[in-house]
Structures are given as C-alpha cells and as structure tokens.
Amino acid sequence: MSLLDHVDPEISAVIRKELDRQRNTLVLVAAENFTSPAVMEAQGCVMTNKYAEGYPGKRYYRGCAFMDEAENLARDRCKKLFGAEHVNVQPHSGSQANMAAYFATLKPGDTIMGMNLDHGGHLSHGSPVNFSGKLYHVVPYGVSRKTEMLDYSEILDVARECRPQMIVCGASAYPRIIDFKAMREIADEVGALLMADIAHIAGLVAAGVHPSPIPYADIVTTTTHKTLRGPRGGVIMCREELAQAIDRAVFPGIQGGPMMHTIAAKAVAFKEAMTPEFRRYQEQIVRNAAALADRLIENGFDLVSGGTDNHLMLVKLLKEGITGKEADETLESAGIALNKNMIPFDPRTPFVTSGIRIGTPAVTSRGMKENEMREIADLITEVIRDMKNPATIESVRSRVRALCERFPLYPELG
C-alpha cells in the first residue's frame, strides 16, 4: 500500500487497522466472508475506469470490447455453476437484484408473500420499512411456533387466502433447508410466480450442499459475497422467457452503468466456485456449523429449531436473561464478532432482540474445523456466562487472538 500511504495516509491507516481487526477477530457474522486475493485484485483493476451502459454487443459507449468479454465470462460461468437458463450479473447488490425482479414481473399494489423479517426473512422481502413493503401489498408467512421451522401446509393456507402474484422464498436468518419443490407446488396451486433469494446459501447451492431452487423457481436472486465468497454484488438468474424483462428492469430500469471491475471480480469468484476445493470448503462450513451448534446445546443454550442444516444458527437468550444487544456488544469486546438477531415471536425490538446469529463461513475460510468450532462455542459460553467480569473478557480476548494466529488471514498482504 505504499502508493496509498503517500497519497492518503489517513485512509491507508484506516485500511490497515481494518485488516488488523479482521486478522485478530473471530468473524462469526453469517453474512460475511473473506474473499480471495485474486477477487480483490480484479475488483481493484482498471475496469473501474470504464462506462459500459447496456449489455454485451449492445453498449451505449464505445471501447467496450473487453467489457463484453469480462461480462460474458461472468454470465457464462454463473450459468454453468448454477445450471441457470439466463443470468444478469449487473445488479450492484442483492436488494437491487430483488428490486429488478419485482419491477420485471409485478405492478405496484400487487400481492407478494414473503417470509416475516422477525422469523428470518429479509428487508427486501416485504418489510414495511423497505421499498418492497411500500410498493406492494405484502402478506408475510412465518415459522411454526411449535417447531420454529417453515410449515408448508400453513404457507399453502396463507397463499390460498391472499392469492399472491409472487411468492418469495429465502431468508437471512433461517437455519434449516428450504424445500423449494414444496414452495413451487404452493405457487402453482395459486397461480403465483416463485422467486428464490439464495443470498445466504448461494455457495452451498453452487457446491451441491443445499438443494437448488433452479429447477423450481421462475427467478433466483443472490448476492455474490457471503457463502459464495466473491465481491459485494448481486446476480439474477431466471427462465429464458423472463430474460428480456429482467434485463430491462436492471438497465435502464433501476441502474445506469454497471460496475465492470466488480463484474470482473464476480467472474473470478464463479471460476473459483467451480473447483473441488470450493465444494470441500462448503461441506466444511456445514460440518463446522453443526459442531458449533451441538457444543452450544451441550453448554446449555437453546437454539432456534434445535439446530442447523446450513451455515448459521440462532441462539435464544431468553432464559439467560440478557438481550442480543448486550451479548453481541460484550462478545465484540472479547474479539468475537457476530450480530444480535430477532428470534421467532421475539418480545423485544429489532434494536435489542432476544437472540444472536452465528455463522461459520468466515472462520471456515481461515481453515478452522470442528475442533476449533467447539473451542469457539466454549469461548462464547464463557463470555455470556460471565459478562460483567473484565478479567473473563480479557482472558477470552487473549485466547481469541491466539486462535486467530494459528490460522493466519491474508499473509500475502504483509
């Protein structure tokens, strides 16, 4: 970073401090991961200089031949990776991918069914504070109070009553496998489109570790970071008959020029995701999540739905008598980064919460396995059981640093 040190030492110092934080923190935020140096190199390339409004072969500006090559590589690799008929790699984020999907297929005021945010859904699936909840009539569905899992017969009942134009399946905090086939059958019964948002599980789906929605959903959206371990961005996959509407909704519908440096980085990430190493990595994510969840249960914690099938888990803190906000703040001071999270039927507000969400993608990227997950679960337990004791916090912080040093992050960055 010698050039940045010279041009902007303040920003250079902030970046170095963030690198140090990532290296010496157990990152358990389920939505975060560590992308490869190759992806970061592509994202910092000269393609950031180029405007490329439009699509390959049909650009508004001249000089886009190599932009076309890069975007076609990204599209073709994503198609192959997921088995999709059509792919748009231009969305700047997952929320913009969802917006484009809605704009391509719905009218303002149409009815959408989406998973309740409090039960594990996402803001862009119809939350009243989000554009999706303001533009469309949203009927939420949730998990069973008894099992804390999706009850597809209950979802069918809701669909029959409201007759939505679209059903959105997918979540940001749901620890179980989603039955996309069942959701397709529900959508077919009421004549609705089915959209699957796989932002959290895209890497698992790409590797065959989680069932794919591609055979069942009309539209599939995702982010390219999280388990997919690419740059921050979005992707839309759809059936060929929706391709033109989707592409027009992205550009010129909601975006102008695409971020070609990010699209180049997406192409790199898709190539990495086609390797046997990536599949082994995804399998390890799931094994690690199971090991961490099992140890937390052994240590006396209650988990939403009793465990996990994927990369994340939700820990209920009601019987501990503490809030998610208190837990995540104290854990961060001990070097463990996760997030407070609503649990199903949570009596507290989203800014306080009764739970925490824990994910294993980032620590798995560092090379940690089941033994380390059990160690991490014990560290979390120690902090939560003795939150008011500064000596405990400092002791855990020291052990977290030692664990991180055993699995170094980005040694090539100096």
UniProtKB/Swiss-Prot annotation:
Its cofactor is pyridoxal 5'-phosphate. GO terms for molecular function: glycine hydroxymethyltransferase activity; pyridoxal phosphate binding. Pathway: One-carbon metabolism; tetrahydrofolate interconversion; Amino-acid biosynthesis; glycine biosynthesis; glycine from L-serine: step 1/1. The record marks 225 as: Plays an important role in substrate specificity. InterPro entries: PyrdxlP-dep_Trfase, PyrdxlP-dep_Trfase_major, PyrdxlP-dep_Trfase_small, Ser_HO-MeTrfase, Ser_HO-MeTrfase-like, Ser_HO-MeTrfase_PLP_BS, SHMT-like_dom. GO terms for cellular component: cytosol. Coiled coil: none annotated. Belongs to the SHMT family. Catalyzes the reversible interconversion of serine and glycine with tetrahydrofolate (THF) serving as the one-carbon carrier. Also exhibits THF-independent aldolase activity toward beta-hydroxyamino acids, producing glycine and aldehydes, via a retro-aldol mechanism. This is Serine hydroxymethyltransferase. It comes from Methanothrix thermoacetophila (strain DSM 6194 / JCM 14653 / NBRC 101360 / PT) (Methanosaeta thermophila). The gene is glyA.
